[in-house]
Amino acid sequence: MQGRLSAWLVKHGLVHRSLGFDYQGIETLQIKPEDWHSIAVILYVYGYNYLRSQCAYDVSPGGLLASVYHLTRIECGIYQPEEVCIKIFVPRNNPRIPSIFWVWKSADFQERESYDMLGISYDNHPRLKRILMPESWIGWPLRKDYITPNFYEIQDAH
């Protein structure tokens, strides 16, 4: 079933794949990484002016990684905002997605956390570096194929 935004994107020739609706009735779309930045700008201009959240997850061990964006269009009505969920899948051997920091500034720490935990690189992000783990940390802790080190170095807080 195609939602309102999906129909609008089709009408304007923008490539995407409808993934249906979630349990709350929020339309979910899949966008290719190479199309994401231009579609993000279009969505912002269309009225999706609030990035509610961005997260990432490992789809399956050795499989794809996903970056998920929850966008809200508040101008439609403050009591019934229109929401959409965007999913972008990337291969784990070269997980690169254009950063949308320059569209929604609130993506800053969220994209950095996804980089830190899963190793997804957000191209053109101004400060893409680890945010939770030390810079010297090896690997991506939330990947399903991550091997946990069998020791942890206790560091002095001083």
Curated annotation (Swiss-Prot):
UniProt key word Glycoprotein: no
Xref: SUPFAM superfamilies: Nqo5-like
Subcellular location as annotated: Plastid, Chloroplast thylakoid membrane
Annotated signal peptide: none
One Pfam family recorded for the sequence: Complex1_30kDa
GO cellular component: chloroplast thylakoid membrane
Gene Ontology process terms (BP): photosynthesis, light reaction
Function: NDH shuttles electrons from NAD(P)H:plastoquinone, via FMN and iron-sulfur (Fe-S) centers, to quinones in the photosynthetic chain and possibly in a chloroplast respiratory chain. The immediate electron acceptor for the enzyme in this species is believed to be plastoquinone. Couples the redox reaction to proton translocation, and thus conserves the redox energy in a proton gradient.
PANTHER family linked: NADH DEHYDROGENASE [UBIQUINONE] IRON-SULFUR PROTEIN 3, MITOCHONDRIAL, NADH DEHYDROGENASE UBIQUINONE IRON-SULFUR PROTEIN 3
Known partners and oligomeric status: NDH is composed of at least 16 different subunits, 5 of which are encoded in the nucleus.
Name of the featured protein: NAD(P)H-quinone oxidoreductase subunit J, chloroplastic
Provenance organism: Lotus japonicus (Lotus corniculatus var. japonicus)
The gene coding this protein: ndhJ
